[in-house]
Amino acid sequence: MRLFAISDLHLSFGVDKPMDIFGDQWVGHADKIRESWDSRITEDDWVLVGGDTSWGLSLQEARPDLDWLGERPGQKILIKGNHCTWWTSLAKVRAVIDDSIHLLQNNAVAMPDGTVVIGARLWDPPEAPWADEKSEKIYN
């Protein structure tokens, strides 16, 4: 068993937002990810997917991206990113994902070797220049 990590896939199989709008280097980015993933990752490996998996705004729009991810080899641990507006609740997302995808949201995922991955939302310190009233409620 090996552990890999990747983030910000920004897949768009369910919406019309190809990554190549950001430049020619992004042409075929999903194919490049698939080729690299499928040639390196085995069914015994685990992959931390650090958020921003899909450009979809709803679960329906993100579903083709989640299906694509489920087709990749290995066990995937998926955490919600700041662009994951489609991730409305654990129950709703769990209902549509492949068994090889494990959701991480204020919980933990134990891997077969005893490694435990813990996930929770990151909160910026209250003195951060971008902190706002919502952040203030967390600390007071």
Task: Map each language-model feature to its residues.
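Short, flexible active-site-adjacent loop segments at beta-strand->alpha-helix junctions, enriched
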Residues: 9-10, 82-83, 107-109, 121-126
